[in-house]
């Protein structure tokens, strides 16, 4: 079982590699589904110097909770386990990083519906977890968000 601290250390190692390899200075972090669920606790556990390099975060179809361990059975049923991490407090830990949260209107459980407009830019798209296949529309939302200063 992964811990938020261990996952944050993994993300830190990847970020340091790409800062050196590409000579960049900041990151926009984007996650879909389980990736969107895992990002907030990972970012919250980054060292302060790397936290300052996170310019924007985009969460696509996030749940309300995450277990940092994948099981194939999770695709069949999505039961909340006692060891699940609630994402709302984790998102609040990474504030004031600009956050875009995108969810499908037909999704039954989404972190996006728990966030206030002060905490995130929230976009609701037609469909469920895969946004009725409108990936061009999702990409346009992401690009619009990333263009913001």
Regions found by a protein language model. Give the residues of each.
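Second-shell loop/turn segments in exported
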Residues: 1-5, 28, 128-131
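Alpha/beta-hydrolase active-site loop
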Residues: 2-22, 41
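A structural signal for isolated positions on well-ordered beta-strands in alpha/beta enzyme cores
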Residues: 28, 56-58, 100
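Gly/Ala-rich beta-loop-alpha elbow adjacent to hydrolase catalytic centers
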Residues: 30-39
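Hydrolases whose catalytic domains are alpha/beta-hydrolase-1, hotdog thioesterase
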Residues: 38-42, 68
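A conserved short beta-strand
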Residues: 50-65
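The feature captures the conserved acid-bearing segment of alpha/beta-hydrolase catalytic domains
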Residues: 62-119
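C-terminal catalytic histidine-bearing segment of alpha/beta-hydrolase fold enzymes
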Residues: 114-115, 119-149
């Amino acid at each position: 079982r992964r811990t938020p601290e261990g996952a944050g250390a993994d993300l830190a190692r990847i970020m340091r590699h790409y800062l050196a390899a590409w000579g960049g200075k900041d990151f926009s972090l984007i996650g879909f589904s389980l990736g969107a669920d895992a990002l907030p606790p990972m970012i919250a556990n980054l060292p302060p110097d790397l936290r300052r390099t996170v310019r924007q975060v985009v969460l696509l179809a996030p749940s309300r909770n995450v277990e940092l361990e994948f099981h194939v059975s999770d695709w069949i049923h999505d039961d909340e386990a006692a060891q699940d991490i609630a994402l709302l407090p984790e998102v609040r830990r990474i504030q004031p990083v600009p956050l875009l949260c995108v969810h499908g209107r037909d999704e039954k459980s989404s972190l996006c519906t728990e966030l206030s407009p002060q905490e995130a830019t929230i976009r609701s798209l037609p469909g469920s977890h895969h946004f009725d296949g409108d990936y061009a529309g999702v990409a346009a939302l992401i690009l619009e968000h990333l263009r913001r200063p």
